[in-house]
């Protein structure tokens, strides 16, 4: 398991480095990071405040309302991007937003949630509560980046599949 996870993490950072070579690559990477962060925060805030039916036994603290909150909060970075792109006339901000970006945010949120559930599943199998001790109370570093890893890998696969088909 740790070998597979190490490979996925390496693949994530290699693809992230590749993305940053593109003209707007840094903005795209920051955008993906923001979507993942807002998705995590939205799931936590809405899940804790609304509560409700549990999402799965794999991760018993996750609720359906939290998942919906993740999807909704994942759209916030669009507003942040629009705000900063209106303040700045820099070429970095020529990344165009349309309906596909909204769908992309929702897909990134879905990948983040799936990544979180997959890591939770493996933690349950290994009978481990936290993946590390560096961030007490947060489940470790891996719990902070599990969604990001799966989001970037998902985007890589979607990108390759779409360009292969078209």
Which residues does each PLM region occupy?
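Membrane-embedded alpha-helical bundles of polytopic integral membrane proteins
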Residues: 1-63, 67-106
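Juxtamembrane boundary at the C-terminal end of a transmembrane helix
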Residues: 156-166
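Secondary-structure boundary/capping signal
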Residues: 25, 54, 130, 165-166
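Active-site catalytic microenvironments for nucleophilic, acid-base chemistry
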Residues: 79, 83, 125, 160
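Acidic (Asp/Glu-rich) catalytic motifs at the cytosolic membrane interface
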Residues: 36-52, 56, 64-65, 110-150
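Short, conserved aromatic-histidine micro-motifs
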Residues: 90-96, 138-139, 145, 164-165
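Hydrophobic alpha-helical transmembrane segments in multi-pass membrane proteins
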Residues: 70, 74-79, 112, 148-155
